[in-house]
């Protein structure tokens, strides 16, 4: 997906609720290029269905059935190519925070609960045999599945679960910090202690050791380094630490694990269902570098480690150019009963995942049946993809092309609310009403008359009904007269002038002209981005605004941690790590907690957001979301770009492909059949 995750740890004053993957995710978003729109473009899109576009070649009817070249091997050329993320960044689930990582994390490691098929709102127990929710969504108790082993033979128990959750935070990496802030740790304590620890853990250390761990933070770090790098549940002191009741993570018994949150939180199971909830083997970790405060495990990052999942890592290519998976010979799901579908044993033994392949290689691999899963960079390549397909006389385009649905995240151009001239609300409203959003949709996200995206009004996307636009606000209208009205007000307030193409001078007619505007985009520029920016450039020129474009890199993005350092306009996207539209979409967009480039910072909104994520009454939440929508709509901090659909190319014999908009797809459910 295009979803971008800032890889920055929690700072002394900010919570980075990185919403990405997702992060957001095991397949590339349809960041799609299009054909030209019809001569008359409707004011609103005429379709939001996911019907596949249909080139119409001549199909020869026959009994021919394409077979995989090797029924024991699946080749995935998608590689989940994000801008700037062509390969995994790490194979340790406590470090990795990039879309390409999911091929390993989804299939080698497992969580207590995992997504139920394609549903983003439902989970099923996996490493937990069952769970209970207590104390008004503030306490979660898990019974750990017995007779489970890691692929190296080490048995799983509740102590391993405790170790994994503590380690996820203690390494100090963005993936843990972003997904547990304000839930199991208080980010305000990080600067004081120089550690990211679950709440109550330092008190547990002090209770078990008699040492001043709550005041001597260097000593506390030394104790934790020693304990986690020489993890031994048979040690009475370590056991006392884990069993201490007044902390975030508590071991209640060899197969019972409890989580106590800082706040009631209805979506916690959805949070831990992805790889930052993965359970790792303490013995392996300790034998390969151990655990140290704010320090990644270089060996684990480079090579991966044993998990409890259906696959294990067989080999890792140079610079993560490819990863090969093979069946976990000790997989617990082979002989277990009532195994959830997401955890079923694998059907195809060998999985080859290729990363960063050039488009021509992907086209050739799929055309010749070498690859079973692939991706075209944009719809402009759809015809090329199908024209090269050696079996097109037997299979229509729709038989190998699948639209999987909308991206749960949002695409945007931020307008820096703290920096001239976008700090003026009338200026931002002028921009909003000067843009033809429908033109953008039809120009950039359609193919052969089929829309491959939809218009939205953020910050929530339609995937999250009923939190999406609960007040039914209209989309910003394309209205040049209204745009000119707002621009005229802004010019008078900010003392600038703008001359329209017809000679009309807006703003303060005696003031200097407003200088050129620059929209920053993530380099390299995709064809979709280019088309969308050119439409916006043309639209704004009708107001007399001069607009240019400038690429930026991920390293530049990570430096934009203040409003003053951030450009006025930034073209990006943001996606949720888990299915909480409030904490994962609204909070990043309308507060400064995640460094989104609009830097929206309104006391009325901040006051609502202080409690909104932790309310347990959905009706009350929706009413407050409606208030935030109304405020944000009139404040206009973002240009909401169309939401692109997710798509994939599959060979016709590939079955059991189950896509989840947040966790992607898993190889163990896939099988080959022509039925």
Which residue stretches match the model-derived regions?
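Secretory targeting signatures
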Residues: 1-60, 414, 419, 431-432
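Gly/Pro-rich hinge or "lid" segments in bacterial periplasmic/extracellular proteins
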Residues: 116-118, 222-245, 254-255, 260-352, ...
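Detector for C-terminal structural segments
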Residues: 25, 103, 265, 322, ...
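N-terminal lobe/hinge region of extracytoplasmic solute-binding protein
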Residues: 76-135, 306
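A bilobed periplasmic-binding-protein/Venus flytrap-type ligand-binding module shared by bacterial periplasmic
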Residues: 115-116, 326-330, 403-430, 434, ...
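Extracellular/periplasmic solute-recognition and catalytic clefts
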Residues: 314-326, 354-419, 442
């Amino acid at each position: 997906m295009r979803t971008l995750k800032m890889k920055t740890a929690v700072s002394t004053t900010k919570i980075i609720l990185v919403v990405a993957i997702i992060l957001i995710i095991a397949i590339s978003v349809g960041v799609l290029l299009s054909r030209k729109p019809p001569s008359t473009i409707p004011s609103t899109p005429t379709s939001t269905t996911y019907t596949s576009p249909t080139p119409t070649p001549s199909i020869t009817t026959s009994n021919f059935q394409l077979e995989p070249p090797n029924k024991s091997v699946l080749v995935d050329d998608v590689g989940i190519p994000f801008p700037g993320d062509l390969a995994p960044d790490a194979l340790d689930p406590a470090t990795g925070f990039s879309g390409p990582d999911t091929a390993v994390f989804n299939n080698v490691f497992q969580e207590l609960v995992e997504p139920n098929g394609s549903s983003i709102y439902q989970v099923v127990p996996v490493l937990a045999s069952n769970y209970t929710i207590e104390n008004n969504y503030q306490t979660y108790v898990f019974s750990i599945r017995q007779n489970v082993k890691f692929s190296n033979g080490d048995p799983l128990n509740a102590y391993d679960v405790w170790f994994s959750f503590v380690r996820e935070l203690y390494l100090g990496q963005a993936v843990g910090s972003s997904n547990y802030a304000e839930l199991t740790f208080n980010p305000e304590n990080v600067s004081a202690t120089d550690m990211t620890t679950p709440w109550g853990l330092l008190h547990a250390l002090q209770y078990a050791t008699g040492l001043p761990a709550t005041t001597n933070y260097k000593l506390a770090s030394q104790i934790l380094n020693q304990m986690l790098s020489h993890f031994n549940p048979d040690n009475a002191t370590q056991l006392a630490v884990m069993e201490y009741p007044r902390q975030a993570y508590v071991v209640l018994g060899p197969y019972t694990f409890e989580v106590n949150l800082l706040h009631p939180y209805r979506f916690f199971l959805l949070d831990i269902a992805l790889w930052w909830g993965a359970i790792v083997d303490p013995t392996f970790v300790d034998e390969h570098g151990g655990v140290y405060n704010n320090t990644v495990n270089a060996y684990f990052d480079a090579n991966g480690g044993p998990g409890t999942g259906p696959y294990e890592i067989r080999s890792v290519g140079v610079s993560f150019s490819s990863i090969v998976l093979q069946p976990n010979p000790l997989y617990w799901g082979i002989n277990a009963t009532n195994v959830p579908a997401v955890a079923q044993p694998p059907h195809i033994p060998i999985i080859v995942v290729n990363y960063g392949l050039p488009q021509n290689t992907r086209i050739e691999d799929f055309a010749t049946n070498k690859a079973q899963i692939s991706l075209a960079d944009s719809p402009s390549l759809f015809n090329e993809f199908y024209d090269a397909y050696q079996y097109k006389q037997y299979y229509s385009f729709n038989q190998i092309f699948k639209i999987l649905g909308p991206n749960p995240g949002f695409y945007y151009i931020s307008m820096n609310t703290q920096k001239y001239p976008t700090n003026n609300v009338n200026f931002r409203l002028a921009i909003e009403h000067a843009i033809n959003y429908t033109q953008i949709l039809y120009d950039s996200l359609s193919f052969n008359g089929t829309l491959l995206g939809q218009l939205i009004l953020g910050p929530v996307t339609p995937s999250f009904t009923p939190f999406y636009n609960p007040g039914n606000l209209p989309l910003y209208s394309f209205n040049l007269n209204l745009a000119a009205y707002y621009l005229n007000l802004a010019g008078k307030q900010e003392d600038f002038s703008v001359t329209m193409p017809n000679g009309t001078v807006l703003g303060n007619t005696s003031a200097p002209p407003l200088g050129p505007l620059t929209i920053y985009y993530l380099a390299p520029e995709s064809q979709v981005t280019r088309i969308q920016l050119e439409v916006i450039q043309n639209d704004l020129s009708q107001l007399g605004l001069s607009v240019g474009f400038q690429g930026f890199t991920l390293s530049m993005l990570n430096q934009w941690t203040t409003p003053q350092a951030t450009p006025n306009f930034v073209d990006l996207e943001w996606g949720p790590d888990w299915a909480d539209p409030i904490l994962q979409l609204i909070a990043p967009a309308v507060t400064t907690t995640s460094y989104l480039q609009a830097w929206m910072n309104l006391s009325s909104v901040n006051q609502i957001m202080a409690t909104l994520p932790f309310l347990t009454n959905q009706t009350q939440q929706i009413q407050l979301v409606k208030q935030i929508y109304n405020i944000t709509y009139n404040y206009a901090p973002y240009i909401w770009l169309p939401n692109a659909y997710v798509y994939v190319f599959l060979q016709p014999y590939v079955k059991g492909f189950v896509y989840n908009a947040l966790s992607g797809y898993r190889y163990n459910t896939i099988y080959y059949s022509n039925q």
